[in-house]
């Protein structure tokens, strides 16, 4: 029997065991397999199985380091029984070090949208309802919208002046910014803060006040264009960890809800020649994992949330 003559249910069973990242190679096997692998019902089934497997044993994240973007597998299975966690490279997705193009972004002065279909930029005029704001840190995407840390200089009654920090959301449907979204803490630029989207479901904040050794992780339990509420996911006193090595100035992180662990990416302090991952739990759990050598002393690893998908880029 030729491979193209196999019954559909058997083909789907075979394809369902193939990692999402390897489907392109499998599609070239034969025309029938290519058609089935792109079918909507199979796609939903395959992605559902991938999500279930991730929840049971491990999950995947996208990490940018050394001008390259990698898909990486994170395994926390058995950490309650003193089994060391791991972060393993799955594949390289893209390389940026040979690019001769650069995007110049001035968020204080203007907002532009790049359209991939038309390969063009669109300038958005008067998109900010409250006038000039300053945006800082990397933005994150959640359910089709983009969120940034922002701040605005405010003069209160009586002449008192201060920077007020908050989140701001850009709605790609209306091409407008929404109102301010409150943070669960009072933030100043002297403190360390980082934003993450968790599997296209929630926003996650890492907060480290400069005057304490406490690290806080906050997760959104309600997120809308005009409102957000937060719950504290984790609070850790970092002074309790004798191997506390990382700084929070270039912090990038992700969380695992099941094991209540945060993973912070950074470089070693002495030479900045190694990329490291720090696994931290609220019960005193602390592990350091090597992510490989680094030739770029000023380039810090950065993590993106990853949701399994069969969509081709």
From Swiss-Prot:
Gene3D superfamilies in alphabetical order: 1.20.1280.50
InterPro entries: F-box-assoc_dom_typ1, F-box-assoc_interact_dom, F-box-like_dom_sf, F-box_dom, SCF_F-box_component
Pfam families hit by this protein: F-box (PF00646), FBA_1 (PF07734)
Domain (F-box): residue spans on this chain: 1-45
NCBIfam families (alphabetical): F_box_assoc_1
Protein name: Putative F-box protein At3g16820
């Amino acid at each position: 029997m030729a491979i193209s003559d196999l019954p559909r249910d058997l083909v789907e069973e075979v394809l369902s065991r193939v990692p999402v990242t390897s489907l392109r190679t499998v599609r070239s096997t034969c025309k029938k397999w290519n058609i089935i692998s792109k079918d909507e019902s199979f796609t939903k089934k395959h992605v559902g199985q991938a999500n279930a497997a991730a929840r049971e044993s491990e999950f995947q994240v996208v990490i940018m380091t050394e001008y390259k973007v990698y898909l990486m597998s994170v395994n926390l299975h058995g950490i309650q029984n003193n089994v060391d966690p791991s972060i393993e490279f799955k594949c390289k997705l893209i390389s940026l070090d040979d690019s001769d193009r650069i995007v110049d972004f001035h968020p204080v002065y203007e907002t532009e949208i790049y359209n991939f279909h038309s390969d063009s930029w669109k300038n958005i005029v008067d998109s900010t309802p409250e006038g000039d704001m300053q945006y800082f840190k990397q933005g994150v995407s959640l359910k089709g919208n983009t969120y940034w840390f922002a701040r605005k200089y405010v003069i209160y009654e009586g002449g008192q002046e201060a920077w007020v920090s908050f989140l701001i959301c850009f709605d790609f449907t209306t091409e407008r910014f929404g109102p301010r979204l409150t943070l669960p803490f009072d933030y100043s630029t002297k403190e360390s803060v980082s934003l993450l989207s968790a599997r296209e479901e929630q926003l996650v904040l890492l907060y480290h006040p400069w005057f304490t050794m406490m690290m806080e992780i906050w997760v959104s339990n309600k997120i809308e264009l005009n409102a957000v509420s937060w719950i504290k996911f984790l609070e850790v006193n970092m002074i309790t960890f004798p191997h506390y090595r990382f700084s929070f100035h270039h912090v990038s992180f992700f969380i695992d809800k099941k094991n209540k662990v945060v993973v912070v990416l950074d470089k070693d302090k002495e030479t900045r020649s190694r990329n490291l991952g720090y696994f931290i739990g609220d019960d005193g759990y602390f592990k350091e994992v090597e992510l490989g050598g680094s030739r770029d002393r000023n380039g810090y690893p950065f993590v993106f949330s990853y949701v399994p998908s069969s969509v081709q880029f």
